[in-house]
């Protein structure tokens, strides 16, 4: 099959053109041997722009064009220097930002069934993806001109390449002996992944239209890239047994070896055990008119996560330059002790169906998951001289319940109505932290969140607020608490004034401490995880009409609206348009506690509970109404049989 998509975007100079081709071949070579080949390929070209943010922040009182039709460029002075405001129309129409993607996937297999119950499968797959990007800013744009300082255009070329090969061998054997049914599966897989990236930027081209290839740029600006690869070898064995379709048992064992870890920690092993009891097959329920299906199940097993950087356990170095001299600098610290992250899961579930044809059905499941050796890329202290390292630094426990129900409320020939509902609740707790990677006893601060032993993950961490300073008297009262320290000063130029957010001194030492790695005045502000979440859907059909609706909900989580805080930070070097909430800011004429005043810098923007909001929601994702034409009408057209 062949498909073509050709569409223009809603934004100026955006488009998407994509070709895709699918080929399938399956054939029986003889009675016991079968082969097949599948090919999927796609070729796409996308014209794109990052102009939306530029347009949203552009001053609405400035024109896009001069009276003669040329582009308008707004000039202004900042600290004695002439600067220019970006014109979003120039960026949209003149910037040449195109990505071309080429992808191909080939899968071939051989299946042999030499005798009853035995199946052998050999499969090879190859996945290739290449992405080339060209991003050219002509000299008339703000970026391409170097801020209108005479630069003659700027071009960045990028290329990404990924190749993934997988060889899989599988043996399956199954047999039924009277009431006993069992099957055994063994799988071996070798996966080879390669990824590369290259980017190069040059400036100053002969013109903006024809001589704009990367080699025609005169001034070198920047380059970067990488070439990575990883191998994964996996073995899986699984056995299923059932007696009279009533008692079920599954045992599995998996071994994974990854080159992403050091030789001493390359392999990890993941066993599992699951049992189930189908009560419906018991005589006392076989003819029950209320309980149509009932199954109890329980399982315990271990799964692993080994996705870290391809050379995550090694110390890496980066190539750079300083004063036009080449140099090699440390990139990340190696860790020979880095190992697989492992999660042991315990699950107990009930599958049910009531009344004829499972008029009401669903599941109820309880689970407990214990994760050890949590993988994380840890930011190191600046004094070490290396930016980061991959580490195993935490243990986490999750406990929860999942419930879903499906009901066929009405089910007649012309009218049917069904409804589905699900809800989940999860509780988690940090049960351990590696002492080498904690910032204070028992906790580790990660930007605006904190991981603390004994508490949940996803906790916002920062300063508590107490409204807004309304007058100088309130400020003077706080400054008097500690004559040796300013009450609330993040920067040396930061001086409190009416309209600023008031932060609380939780340590009671008379001032709010902003020193790095000082947590005396910081506290947990809320959680990004909900108390519970779920979804629902309904479908109503009457003759040829069908109405359907689906939605999701979440309750109890908080969200930090970063963009909201930025509306009250003034950037004199680059004035921009703001959201209308800035009109509700504090002023002497509007002494509100809703929003602070706009200021050049200070503590009004940052992680405080002032910018945290209740993120509970109820969302309707989809509503549709369709009508299906009667089949006899369509037969009269001659298009269908």
Regions found by a protein language model. Give the residues of each.
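Acidic, glycine-rich flexible loop segments
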Residues: 54-89
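Extracytoplasmic gating/loop element in the C-terminal half of outer-membrane beta-barrel translocons
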Residues: 258, 554-639
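Periplasmic-side early beta-strands and strand-to-turn transitions of outer-membrane beta-barrels
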Residues: 1-16, 47-51
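Extracellular/periplasmic, surface-exposed regions of secreted and cell-surface proteins
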Residues: 18, 24-33, 38-43, 81-137, ...
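Conserved small-residue
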Residues: 391, 408-526
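C-terminal extracellular loops and terminal segments
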Residues: 393-397, 439-460, 519, 525-539, ...
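Solvent-exposed loop segments that connect transmembrane elements
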Residues: 64, 138-154, 319-330, 380-389, ...
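Glycine-rich, aromatic-lined ligand/substrate-binding cores of catalytic
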Residues: 525-561
């Amino acid at each position: 099959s062949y498909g073509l998509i050709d569409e223009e975007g809603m934004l100026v100079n955006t488009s998407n053109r994509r070709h895709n081709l699918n080929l399938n071949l399956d054939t029986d070579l003889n009675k016991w041997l079968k082969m097949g080949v599948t090919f999927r390929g796609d070729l796409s070209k996308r014209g794109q722009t990052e102009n939306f943010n530029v347009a949203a922040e552009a001053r609405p009182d400035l024109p896009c064009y001069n009276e003669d039709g040329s582009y308008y460029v707004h000039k202004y002075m900042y600290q004695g220097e002439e600067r220019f405001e970006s014109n979003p129309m120039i960026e949209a129409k003149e910037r040449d930002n195109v990505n071309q993607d080429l992808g191909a996937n080939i899968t071939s297999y051989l299946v042999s069934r030499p005798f009853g119950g035995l199946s052998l499968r050999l499969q090879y797959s190859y996945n290739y993806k290449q992405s080339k990007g060209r991003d050219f800013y002509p000299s008339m744009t703000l970026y391409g001109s170097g801020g209108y300082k005479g630069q003659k255009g700027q071009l960045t070329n990028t290329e990404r390449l990924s190749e993934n090969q997988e060889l899989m061998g599988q043996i399956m054997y199954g047999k039924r002996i009277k009431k006993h049914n069992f099957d055994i599966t063994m799988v071996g897989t070798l996966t080879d992944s390669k990824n590369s990236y290259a980017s190069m930027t040059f400036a100053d081209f002969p013109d903006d239209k024809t001589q704009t290839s990367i080699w025609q740029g005169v001034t070198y600006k920047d380059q970067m890239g990488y070439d990575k690869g990883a191998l994964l070898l996996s073995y899986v064995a699984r056995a299923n047994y059932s007696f009279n379709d009533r008692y079920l048992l599954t045992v599995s064992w998996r071994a994974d070896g990854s080159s992403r870890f050091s030789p001493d920690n390359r392999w990890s092993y993941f066993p599992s055990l699951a049992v189930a009891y189908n009560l419906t097959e018991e005589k006392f329920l076989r003819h029950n008119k209320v309980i149509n299906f009932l199954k109890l199940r329980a399982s315990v097993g271990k799964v692993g996560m080994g996705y870290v950087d391809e050379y995550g356990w090694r110390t890496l170095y980066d190539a750079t330059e300083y004063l036009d001299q080449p140099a090699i600098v440390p990139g990340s610290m190696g860790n020979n002790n880095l190992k697989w992250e492992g999660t042991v899961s315990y699950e107990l579930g009930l599958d049910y169906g009531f009344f004829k044809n499972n008029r009401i059905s669903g599941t109820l499941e309880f689970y407990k998951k214990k994760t050890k050796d949590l993988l994380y890329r840890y930011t190191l202290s600046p004094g070490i001289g290396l930016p980061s390292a991959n580490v195993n630094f935490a243990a986490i426990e999750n406990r929860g319940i999942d419930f879903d129900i499906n009901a066929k409320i009405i089910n007649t020939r012309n009218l049917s109505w069904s409804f589905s509902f699900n809800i989940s609740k999860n509780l988690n707790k940090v049960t351990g932290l590696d002492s080498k990677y904690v910032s204070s006893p028992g906790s580790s601060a990660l930007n605006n969140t904190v991981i603390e032993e004994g508490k949940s993950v996803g906790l916002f961490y920062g300063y508590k607020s107490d409204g807004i300073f309304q007058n100088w008297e309130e400020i003077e009262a706080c400054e008097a608490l500690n004559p040796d320290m300013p009450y609330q000063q993040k920067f040396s130029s930061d001086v409190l004034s009416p309209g600023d957010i008031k932060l609380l001194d939780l340590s009671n030492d008379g001032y709010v401490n902003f020193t790095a790695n000082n947590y005396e005045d910081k506290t947990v502000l809320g959680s990004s995880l909900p108390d519970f979440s779920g979804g629902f859907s309904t479908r109503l059909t009457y003759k040829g009409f069908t109405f359907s609706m689906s939605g999701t909900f979440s309750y109890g989580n908080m969200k930090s609206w970063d963009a909201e805080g930025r509306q009250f930070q003034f950037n004199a070097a680059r004035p921009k348009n703001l959201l209308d909430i800035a009109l509700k800011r504090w002023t002497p004429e509007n002494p509100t506690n809703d929003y602070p005043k706009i200021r050049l810098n200070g503590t009004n923007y940052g992680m405080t509970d002032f910018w945290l909001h209740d993120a509970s929601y109820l969302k309707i994702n989809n509503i549709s109404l369709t009508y299906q034409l009667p089949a006899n009408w369509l037969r009269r057209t001659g298009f269908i049989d």
